[in-house]
């Protein structure tokens, strides 16, 4: 929101400097982004009247001018401006004047003729970036008056960076209210008398979509002179607010929007047919807008139409065919309230925006529509003449402002201030809030222009703003801190992160909303209908809540590969999102924490002491086992859409499924153009944080006995299944069984494979005898034979 300080001070004039006012607004939540003077410093420049112009005898591009500067005698000035002419009133810098750029005007001879001053352009005065000639002033400009005074150049431009909830401050009226409430200064708000109708002409208004447009005011004006010039004071205020002056009728609607915060629109009444309707667009309806863009209007877009055709996108932009021109003499003036939900996002959908949509989608004072149309009528009649008909008002159910309870004790507790009910009542009165006191509590009814007061915390914020954030004392919080004992059965999250970092992994943090394609490629058992889609995504590629962390890690890998990183280790801890009927704390959704990782490139960093080898399934499996040690994990074959069908496993801990590991599926390796298949894993983070409490076990002082055993089994026998079959079936002397070789080929029958195991046997009380070892080995072989049809390899 941009405006001039002089305009604001006509409504409220606190005894503060510009800088003090800027600081006060910022500390009250209305951040002043820029505070700039309208014009740079200069002096001794006055309004001058050009009396005579003759060509310079010695220069083709120069003129010798006789100028009245109000001193009583004509002044000779040599001027090279192409637009200098007799009768013009222009700025004149007198001798001794200091112009922007540290340029001092002196009496000097120009090609033999003495020049006592300089006629100035807007650029030379520093009030415009470009200028093609002298700054021409209105014919009634008083000769001799200081140009700074005449053009009101001792003014400042404020630009506020407003938050979306403060739509009430998108007008001078709203800002004046705020300044008055903050400073206690008296406000002189615009008095808008009702314009008495002088003609009976009117046009019926029909609310076909009352929820989107519950209030519409319209008025016919006739005999209007659209070519009448806009007053200089209005043009100046508009331009200093960042709005270009166009024509008197357009300028009036823009001026009222800035002054009162109510966007208006003017239609050429002769181009309308029948009643005016506020309705939703019809199928295949098209509209040529004022920006010369033709759009196909969607069915959820509110339009203003007559009985035959659409006229405008309601609250956004008017149509070209019903727009006013300099030939317009009869107009239909609109002032309406459009519900924010009916306007929000519609302009962006078509790739443009407007000052009107910026206000309506945030919320416009529904109590100010009638006042705005009266104010605009008043200005149009003063500037353009004409006659006004009666205001036709169509009204449905307007928003109901529900009272909000404020407890004084609650406000004092949140702010840490001993305010008292009387002080709070004074602050609310300064904001023009309607309230009822019930002891130390308040029932506050928000005004029609405040859409941001809905809960008690909103009112506490208002108290803090008016009291002054910088007046609230800084008090350090105090509390009795109790040392929290970390249970042995839980691993702290920071320790798990540190362990992964120690193994060469780097932590990443990705958005929880992802591409729908990632879910299709990497998610397990998630149908298209089960995707959790965002109602209003920030981008099309961020439209779905993730159910797996794999997609983000693959995207991170691609980014690293583009930056020539050949060895990548990544992990992420984050929530995933799943539909579940009984999930808490969010009904219908389960949001578990997951730990996922990715390894790509060499198994080890390049070095002279080790050969180059690509990371594989077993490297990452070892990382997971080290992370969860001393827990013993089980790995079972797994079919997963994201993983290689023969190089993927489900991870189980104490019989519970806690995640998966595997190479990325070849189809996705090809689709995402990866040089090799990365190995990924995803674990239930809560399960990973669970730890086995260490228990004492005696270390044997007697030597172990190691035997090797090779058996032949069917090709389809899975190692884990084979080891599971031994539990409880073999001697207690056997401490460990490790697979050290798998062989298929010569000497092994077809469809068979040879598995070689290293058996470690030991007792804590004595040295084992050969007979005991032989018996244990025979028992082991018998188990292999009976359970899996295994045979000793010859």
UniProtKB/Swiss-Prot annotation:
Keywords: Aminoacyl-tRNA synthetase, ATP-binding, Cytoplasm, Ligase, Magnesium, Metal-binding, Nucleotide-binding, Protein biosynthesis, RNA-binding, tRNA-binding. The keyword Ligase applies. It catalyses: tRNA(Phe) + L-phenylalanine + ATP = L-phenylalanyl-tRNA(Phe) + AMP + diphosphate + H(+). Binds 2 magnesium ions per tetramer. This is Phenylalanine--tRNA ligase beta subunit. Belongs to the phenylalanyl-tRNA synthetase beta subunit family. Type 1 subfamily. Residues 39-148 form the tRNA-binding domain. It holds the Pfam family tRNA_synthFbeta. HAMAP family: Phe_tRNA_synth_beta1 (MF_00283). Residues 700-793 form the FDX-ACB domain. GO terms for molecular function: ATP binding; magnesium ion binding; phenylalanine-tRNA ligase activity; tRNA binding. Residues 399-474 form the B5 domain. Its EC number is 6.1.1.20. Its cofactor is Mg(2+). The lineage of its organism: Bacteria, Pseudomonadati, Pseudomonadota, Betaproteobacteria, Rhodocyclales. GO terms for cellular component: phenylalanine-tRNA ligase complex. It comes from Dechloromonas aromatica (strain RCB). One of its GO terms (biological process) is phenylalanyl-tRNA aminoacylation. The keyword Protein biosynthesis applies.
């Amino acid at each position: 929101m941009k405006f001039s300080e002089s305009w604001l001070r006509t409504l409220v004039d606190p005894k503060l400097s510009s800088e003090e006012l800027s600081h006060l607004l910022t500390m009250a939540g209305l951040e002043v982004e820029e505070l700039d003077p309208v014009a740079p410093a200069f002096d001794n420049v006055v309004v001058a009247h050009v009396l005579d112009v003759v060509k310079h005898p010695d220069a083709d591009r120069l003129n010798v001018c006789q100028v009245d500067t109000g001193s009583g005698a004509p002044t000779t000035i040599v001027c090279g401006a192409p637009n200098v002419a007799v009768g013009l009133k222009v700025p004149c810098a007198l001798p001794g004047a200091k112009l922007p750029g540290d340029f001092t005007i002196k009496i000097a001879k120009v090609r033999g003729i003495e020049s006592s001053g300089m006629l100035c352009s807007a650029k030379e005065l520093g009030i415009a970036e470009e200028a093609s000639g002298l700054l021409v002033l209105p014919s009634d400009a008083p000769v001799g008056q200081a140009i700074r005074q005449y053009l009101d150049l001792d003014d400042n431009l404020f630009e506020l960076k407003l938050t979306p909830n403060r739509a009430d401050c998108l007008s001078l009226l709203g800002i004046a209210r705020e300044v008055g409430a903050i400073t206690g200064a008296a406000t002189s708000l615009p008095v808008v008398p009702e314009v008495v109708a002088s003609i009976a002409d009117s046009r019926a208004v029909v609310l076909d979509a009352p929820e989107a447009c519950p209030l519409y005011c319209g008025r016919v004006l006739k005999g209007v002179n659209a070519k009448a010039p806009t007053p200089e004071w209005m043009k100046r205020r508009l331009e200093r607010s960042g709005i270009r002056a166009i024509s008197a009728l357009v300028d009036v609607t823009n001026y009222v929007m800035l002054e009162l915060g109510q966007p208006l629109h003017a239609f050429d009444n002769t181009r309308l047919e029948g009643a005016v309707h506020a309705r939703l667009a019809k199928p295949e309806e098209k509209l040529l807008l004022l920006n010369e863009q033709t759009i196909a209007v969607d069915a959820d877009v509110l339009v203003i139409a007559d009985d035959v055709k659409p006229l405008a996108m309601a609250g956004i932009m008017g149509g070209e065919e019903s727009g006013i021109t300099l030939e317009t003499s009869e107009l239909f003036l609109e002032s309406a309230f459009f519900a924010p939900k009916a306007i929000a996002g519609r302009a962006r959908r078509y790739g443009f925006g407007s000052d009107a949509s910026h206000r309506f989608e945030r919320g416009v004072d529904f109590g100010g529509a009638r006042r705005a149309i009266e104010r605009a009528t008043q200005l149009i009649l003063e500037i353009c003449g004409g006659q006004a008909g009666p205001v036709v008002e169509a009204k449905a159910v307007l928003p109901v402002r529900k009272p909000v309870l404020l407890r004084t004790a609650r406000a004092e507790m949140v702010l840490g201030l001993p305010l008292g009910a009387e002080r709070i009542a004074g602050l609310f009165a300064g904001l023009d809030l309607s309230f009822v006191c019930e002891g130390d509590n308040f029932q506050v009814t928000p005004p029609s222009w405040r859409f941001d007061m809905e809960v008690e915390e909103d009112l506490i914020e208002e108290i803090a703003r008016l009291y002054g954030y910088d007046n609230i004392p800084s008090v350090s919080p105090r509390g009795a801190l109790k040392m929290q004992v970390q249970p042995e059965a839980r691993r702290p999250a920071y320790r798990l992160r540190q362990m992964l970092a120690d193994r060469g992994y780097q932590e990443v943090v990705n958005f929880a909303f992802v591409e729908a394609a990632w879910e299709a490629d990497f998610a397990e058992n998630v149908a298209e209908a089960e995707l959790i889609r965002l109602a209003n995504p920030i981008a099309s590629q961020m439209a779905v809540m993730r159910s797996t962390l794999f997609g983000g890690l693959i995207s991170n890998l691609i980014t690293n590969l583009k930056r020539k990183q050949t060895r990548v280790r990544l992990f992420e801890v984050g929530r995933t999102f799943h539909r579940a009927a009984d999930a808490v704390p969010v009904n219908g959704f389960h949001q578990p924490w997951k730990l996922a990782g990715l390894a790509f490139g060499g198994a080890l960093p390049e070095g002279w002491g080790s050969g180059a080898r690509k990371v594989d399934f077993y490297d990452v499996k070892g990382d997971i086992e080290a992370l969860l040690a001393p827990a013993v994990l089980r790995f079972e074959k797994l079919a997963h859409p994201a993983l290689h069908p023969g190089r993927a496993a489900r991870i189980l801990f104490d019989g519970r499924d806690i995640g998966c590991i595997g190479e990325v599926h070849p189809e996705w390796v090809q689709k995402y153009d990866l040089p090799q298949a990365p190995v990924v894993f995803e674990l239930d983070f809560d399960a990973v944080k669970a730890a086995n409490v260490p228990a004492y076990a005696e270390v044997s002082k007697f030597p172990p006995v190691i035997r090797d055993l090779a058996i032949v089994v069917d090709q389809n026998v899975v190692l884990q299944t084979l080891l599971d079959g031994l539990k409880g079936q073999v001697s207690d002397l056997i401490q460990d069984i490790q697979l050290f070789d798998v062989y298929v080929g010569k000497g092994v029958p077809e469809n068979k494979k040879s598995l070689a195991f290293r058996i470690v046997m030991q007792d804590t009380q004595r040295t084992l005898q050969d007979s005991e070892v032989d018996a244990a080995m025979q028992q082991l072989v018998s188990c292999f034979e009976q359970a899996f049809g295994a045979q000793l390899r010859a």
